[in-house]
């Protein structure tokens, strides 16, 4: 299920069927002008890729730093995930959503980086050593 703004009953057409029982999280509509996908890999921002929107808007790096600080306090955080951030029409940097690495696309991340990204999460899920975790070789 993808996020969308529901303004009338017609907007619900195609959102599911009677056999499914989705949990739906509602919020007020936000005017997001630009979005980026932050790839989080072992508690660090691995890369940030533009997702969509108006190039005139840019994110506040101090907000990203705070998001990461808060993320690191989450005890059961994934080894790899994505955090989508956006900038609103009034230039506020916000978290749009967070998703597990195994269910996110590469969105322009280089192939070898994406492979390492996915490997980290799968290794964590299956409680195995990550064969592509090269951090152990760094001084």
Located regions from the model:
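Active-site nucleotide/adenylate-binding loops and adjacent lid/helix of ATP-dependent enzymes
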Residues: 2-72, 139
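A long amphipathic alpha-helix within ATP-dependent nucleotide-binding catalytic cores
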Residues: 47-95, 114-138
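A short beta-strand motif that forms the metal-chelation/ATP-contact edge
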Residues: 37-40, 91-104
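Generic, low-specificity signal for short hydrophobic/alpha-helical stretches with a mild N-terminal bias
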Residues: 20, 80, 96-100
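Functionally constrained cores in energy, signaling, and assembly domains
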Residues: 26, 86, 106
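Nucleotide/phosphate-binding sheet-loop regions of phosphoryl- and nucleotidyl-transfer enzymes
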Residues: 2-13, 99, 104-110, 122
């Amino acid at each position: 299920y993808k996020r969308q703004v529901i303004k009338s009953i017609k907007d619900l057409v195609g959102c599911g069927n009677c056999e499914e029982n989705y949990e739906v999280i509602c919020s007020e509509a936000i005017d997001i002008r630009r979005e980026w996908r932050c790839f989080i890999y072992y508690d660090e921002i691995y890369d940030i890729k533009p997702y969509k929107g108006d190039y005139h808007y840019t994110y506040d790096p101090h907000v990203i730093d705070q998001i990461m600080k808060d993320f690191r306090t989450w005890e059961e955080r994934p080894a790899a995930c994505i955090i989508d951030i956006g900038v609103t029409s009034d230039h506020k940097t916000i978290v749009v959503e967070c998703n597990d690495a195994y269910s996110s696309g590469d969105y322009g991340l280089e192939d070898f980086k994406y492979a390492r990204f996915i490997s980290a999460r799968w290794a964590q899920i299956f409680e195995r050593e990550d064969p592509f975790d090269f951090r152990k070789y760094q001084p």
